[in-house]
């Protein structure tokens, strides 16, 4: 992808060492390294865009990491992040923010590319979602569009991270976001991709119903609670809006138990129901994908796209062969006769 708060993401655990090697030159002022090509890119929280026969991948990392591909089989990892210098407002809004940017999302709307990103510190909900834009992905410079939304400890019961843009059937822009606390939030946006006047966030999904008390303890944070849901992504298909979310815990390498669930609605702002008819605000969600324990221990933080006549699902997976490092997972989406998405296998 996500959000009016800060969140539950130890993005620093499995991918940081890799990305610090790639981007250390951007921090040190030394000459930039050359791009390199890989068929198995290490990513966290990947999102994708397509323009002029080129795929672009953006993911968590110092200043937002980026790579390109012509075929989605081999990827050129670019040595420079999107932002080598973070906007001043990010440090002012999020004390302790270290420029390790989480969970971007990107979309084209009204002739521009818009990229949202998360600024936070692990396990707390003092967070912010920033915005960049430019006319073309090939254009060299992203324009700083400021902050979309912030969350504050003690003020908000949601976390402003993991943004996801969705444009509805009436060409209206919306944004979802969220991680733990009171779950997945949503607001309507104006034409500048900021929160529309008078809009207030509404909860559209929780891991558990708010009335539930018998839920597993949170092993990663004493602040965020047990509502282990995050990383929303809404995908339009055949008159439905499909809300994908990630359940449980990321960012612990081979100890992660992340997995993906889905629900759907005829209306962009819900209610989203799972295949059994349970509202996702009450803990509903149909399991869509989890680790197969052969190739991946766990999978999550997904995105879905319709590109070149194909529906594509991407996420990161904690690779068993790579000792729990997170790598890119890509699969074609299939559809049941009654309109539910599925993947045949993960391998």
Enumerate the predicted regions with their spans.
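Bacterial N-terminal signal peptides that target proteins for export
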Residues: 2-14
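Detector for intrinsically disordered, low-structure N-terminal pre-sequences
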Residues: 5, 21-24, 36
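Enriched but not universal
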Residues: 9, 25-26
């Amino acid at each position: 992808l996500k959000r009016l708060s800060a969140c539950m993401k130890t993005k620093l655990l499995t991918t940081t060492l890799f990305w610090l090697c790639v981007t250390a030159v951007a921090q040190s002022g030394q000459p930039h390294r050359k791009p390199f090509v890989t068929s198995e890119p290490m990513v966290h929280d990947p999102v994708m865009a397509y323009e002029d026969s080129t795929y672009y991948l953006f993911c968590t990392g110092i200043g937002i990491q980026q790579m390109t591909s012509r075929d989605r089989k081999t990827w050129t990892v670019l040595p420079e992040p999107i932002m080598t210098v973070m906007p001043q407002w990010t440090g002012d809004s999020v004390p302790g923010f270290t420029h390790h940017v989480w969970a971007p999302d990107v979309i084209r709307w009204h002739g521009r590319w818009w990229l949202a990103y998360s600024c936070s510190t692990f396990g707390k909900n003092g967070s912010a979602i920033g915005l960049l834009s430019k006319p073309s992905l090939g254009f060299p410079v992203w324009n700083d569009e400021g902050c979309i939304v912030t969350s504050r400890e003690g003020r908000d019961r949601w976390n402003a991270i993991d943004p996801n843009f969705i444009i509805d059937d009436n060409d209206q822009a919306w944004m979802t976001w969220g991680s733990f606390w009171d779950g997945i939030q949503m607001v309507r946006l104006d034409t500048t991709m900021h929160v529309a006047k008078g809009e207030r966030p509404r909860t559209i999904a929780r891991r558990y119903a708010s009335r539930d008390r018998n839920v597993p303890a949170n092993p990663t944070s004493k602040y965020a609670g047990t509502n282990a849901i995050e990383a929303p992504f809404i995908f339009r298909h055949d008159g439905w809006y499909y809300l994908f979310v990630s359940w449980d815990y990321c960012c612990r390498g081979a100890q992660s138990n992340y997995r993906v669930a889905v629900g759907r609605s005829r209306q962009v702002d819900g209610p989203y129901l799972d295949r059994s008819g349970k509202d996702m605000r009450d803990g509903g969600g149909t399991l869509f994908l989890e680790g197969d324990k052969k190739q991946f221990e766990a999978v999550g933080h997904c995105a879905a796209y319709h590109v070149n006549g194909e529906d594509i699902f991407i996420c990161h997976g904690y690779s068993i062969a790579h000792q729990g490092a997170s790598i890119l997972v890509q699969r074609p989406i299939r559809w049941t006769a009654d309109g539910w998405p599925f993947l045949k296998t993960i391998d």
